[in-house]
Structures are given as C-alpha cells and as structure tokens.
Amino acid sequence: ALNFDPNTQEVDAKLASQTVWLDAYITNVDRTFRNTNLLLWHKELWLIDHGAAFYFHHSWDTWEKHAMSPFALIKDHVLLPQATLIEEVNAEFQTLLTNEKLKTIVDLLPDDWLNWEGNEQTPDEIRAIYYQFLVLRKSHAATFVNQAQHARATLI
C-alpha cells in the first residue's frame, strides 16, 4: 500500500464526496493535507486511522451539541476540493444508513473497546450514546453538508 498523495493522485467526485460526508458525519478531524490517512492499495482508496473521529467522546456531557454541530474543521479535509457531489451523497446515505442499520453497527462494538479507566458507564450505556449521536447527527446532516459546501466554495 502507498500513502495517498493529493498532489499526484486524484479521487473521483463521488468517492471524494462520500469520504467528506462520512468524515463530517463522524466528526473526523484527521484527514488533512498534512496527514491524509488514506492509502492506495491495488488502485483502490482505503480510509485508515479513524482514531480522531467522534471527538465528542473526550467530553461525554456535550455529545448532543456535537451531534448538531456544523463541523467547521471540514474546511481542512484533503478531498474537499474534489467533493462536488455532497448533496447527492447526503441523499444516498440518508436512505442507506437507516436507524436499524446504525443500531446493528453500534451493537458490534466490543465491550473491551468501551471499558477504560475512570469510566463509570457500562458498555451498553456507551453504545446507546453512540447510537443516539449517529441518529441525531444524521437528522441534522444538512448542517454539516452546508458547512462542507460553504468551505468548498471558499476554496474555489
């Protein structure tokens, strides 16, 4: 696998828009020109290292505020210049990511990932917060989609 280099490699508008939408949705602050966290493997783009996503989990008390935020840091996304189809992707992902599907995904989180020193919540309580975050964030997707489109317009 090779590191993705935005100066020498291109991503089509659909994939760029899907990636920008996903990163705005999960509030991933770590896919920038300095650190793309993208690999090319057999001519396919792979998204790696989502450790900086869901940054609300550093302050559990504010998860609802983060779920409704515009996510201003999307302005630094490495694929934002190519992401011309964000509205189309939003419509597609709104249909694809049903609440039932989100619940299934969140239920797959292992208990070991949800237990850490100083944590007073059970894994099921933490899963419930992640699920609620994802559902609320999806219902407010227009906020982060508009933010991404505005940020993209300032680049052009």
Q: In which residue ranges do the predicted regions lie?
A:
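Phosphate/dinucleotide-binding and metal-coordinating scaffold of catalytic cores
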Residues: 1-156
